[in-house]
UniProtKB/Swiss-Prot annotation:
Gene name, Swiss-Prot/TrEMBL: thiM
Record-linked InterPro entries: Hyethyz_kinase (IPR000417), Ribokinase-like (IPR029056)
Metabolic or biological pathway: Cofactor biosynthesis; thiamine diphosphate biosynthesis; 4-methyl-5-(2-phosphoethyl)-thiazole from 5-(2-hydroxyethyl)-4-methylthiazole: step 1/1
Organism for this UniProt entry: Alkaliphilus oremlandii (strain OhILAs) (Clostridium oremlandii (strain OhILAs))
Protein name: Hydroxyethylthiazole kinase
Catalytic activity: 5-(2-hydroxyethyl)-4-methylthiazole + ATP = 4-methyl-5-(2-phosphooxyethyl)-thiazole + ADP + H(+)
Length: 271
């Protein structure tokens, strides 16, 4: 109950503060990320040119780095934005999309981890395992290893190694800061059938962490919001409706998300 009270405080602060979440993200889901940030009560900005990212970070509440569509230009921007955020004590969330799929992708992640202090690392099991160093194969940007065996240990170990909070998303989401570890059992399988739910989760985490009410709490709440919204979206579907309607209902559920959702529907336990 104490954790849920803390999560409710974070949600309340999003509504009061409207945190500015600076994204340097991919062009596949950029619109979804902007809209989900607005839906939860934050304010998105998607500037990615190296000539302005430091200025933009200076007025932001959180920074989300997403490597989905990599190029040399944005790699420079990732590092500049991350370093500026570190300098100003602004949370940095990294979404290592497709980690391990290519050497270029792996080298980029290594560069970011070397030069930027993360607040949150959010990925699916194969992405996190790849960064951890267990050599799990990644095919495209989809996880090919959905097993949660050892997930808790990997999350704790990587969180300690990187001195950040690690979020592993899957059938059961795992969130750890190295000291405390939680399992979140919200969500619906349809979330994996539309593009961008992982990217949008990182945006939600950014908005939550941007309140200044705790990185671990922000990571838990951002992850939980997506899971509960997925459940509520599925419940609204009529027989003839499919993934298009699901995505619309998902956005509706986030925009209507309130403290009752946390208290009555949140399935989070320390493990």
């Amino acid at each position: 109950m104490e954790l849920k009270n803390e999560l409710c405080t974070v949600l309340e602060q999003i509504k009061e503060k409207t945190p500015l979440v600076h994204h340097i993200t991919n062009y596949v889901t950029v619109n979804d990320c902007a809209n989900i940030t607005l839906a939860i009560g934050g304010s998105p900005v998607m500037a990615d040119d190296h000539k302005e990212v430091e200025d933009m970070v200076s007025i932001a509440s959180a920074v989300v780095l997403n490597i989905g569509t990599l190029n040399e230009r944005t790699i420079e921007s990732f590092v500049l934005a991350g370093k500026k955020a570190n300098e100003l004590n602004i949370p940095v969330i990294l979404d290592p999309v497709g980690a391990g799929a290519t050497a270029f992708r792996s080298q980029t992640i290594e560069k970011i981890l070397k030069e930027v202090k993360l607040s949150v690392l959010r990925g699916n099991m194969s992405e996190i395992k790849n960064i951890y160093g267990t050599g799990t194969q990644t095919k495209g940007v989809d996880s090919v290893d959905s097993s949660l065996d050892g997930g808790k240990e990997i999350a704790i170990s990587l969180a300690k190694k990187l001195s950040c909070t690690v979020v592993i998303t899957g059938e059961v989401d795992i969130v750890s800061d190295g000291n405390k570890t939680y399992a979140i059992q919200n969500g619906h399988k349809a979330l994996s059938s539309i593009t961008g739910t992982g990217c949008m989760s990182a945006s939600l985490i950014g908005a939550c962490c941007g309140t200044g009410k705790g990185i671990l709490q922000g990571a838990i709440l951002g992850t939980m919001i997506m899971g509960i919204a997925g459940e509520k979206a599925n419940e609204r579907l009529k027989v003839h409706e499919g993934l298009g309607s699901f995505k619309v209902y998902l956005m509706d559920a986030v925009s209507n998300f309130d403290q009752d959702d946390i208290r009555k529907r949140g399935k989070v336990d320390e493990i």
